[in-house]
Amino acid sequence: GMVGEVMLKVLAERNFPVTELIPVASERSVGKEIDYKGTKYKVVGMQTAVDMKADIAVFSAGGDTSLEWAPKFAAAGTTVIDNSSAWRKKKKKKLVVPEINASTLTKEDKIIANPNCSTIQMVLALAPLHKKYNIKRVIVSTYQSITGTGVKAVKQLENEYAGIQGDMAYKYPIHRNAIPQCDSFEENGYTKEEMKLVRETQKIIGDKTIAVTATAVRVPIVGGHSEAVNVEFANDFNVSEVREILHHTDGVTVQDNLDTFSYPMPLFAQGKNDVFVGRIRRDESQPNSLNMWIVS
């Protein structure tokens, strides 16, 4: 799938030390070949992969698959990094953003949860600021790429752009539209995506007292999520110091020069690994509050 292809691309770009690559998929894909750095690897089934006792297994196959198979890989001694939401809320499972809380991991952590994409980019900017100024509240509105929905959504946009009837990933047209629903609704009126931003932010930063409220919107963009983030701190801050802190944060690139119209945009963030932060300014309507524009 799309996510697996991008994972392989990133592993290759970063020259991740791979002795042997084991592509794993459902039975219908077993036997197919995957190209990685010029070498062909045959796709194997789940049980075969478990029996091969790999060092690391990266899961991106949905929650049900992860709940069934991640424990089997872990029992065989494999460290599982799971991209689904299946393990994120489990109290005994770590929710990890390496730049923030990788130091909490131990050899006993055999199933490691990967946070939601929109959460990762936000907490990378928030975590160092929380250490300095103590965050009280976060208000975030997201403008999320259709790639988060998958190949079907990309095809829907392409069809609508070309004026062709086809399968719909969404209940409504996405071309020239903005849909204020990412994932299904929960009983409180928020979507699952919005509640991930709430719960995961608190868990990763390690502070349940941080109040978070979110509105997640799907927009007709292919690649790159954007977020308008308002942060209220317990302590006052200096905007120049905020820029300096973010400038020295691993995984963050500050693009914030109004004289040259420099600010983050999803078009230019696509295919890059960093989180881009700009439009950094004091919220003049509320004490100790800051506005940022975060793109990744």
Predicted regions: what is each one?
Residues E27-S29, C117-S118, T142-T149, A178-F185, ...:
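Glycine-rich beta-alpha junction loops
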Residues T106-A113, N177-E187, S289-I294:
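Helix-loop-beta segment of a Rossmann-like dinucleotide-binding subdomain
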Residues Y133, I205-G206, F233, D250:
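A broad structural signal for alpha-helix termini and local helix breaks/kinks
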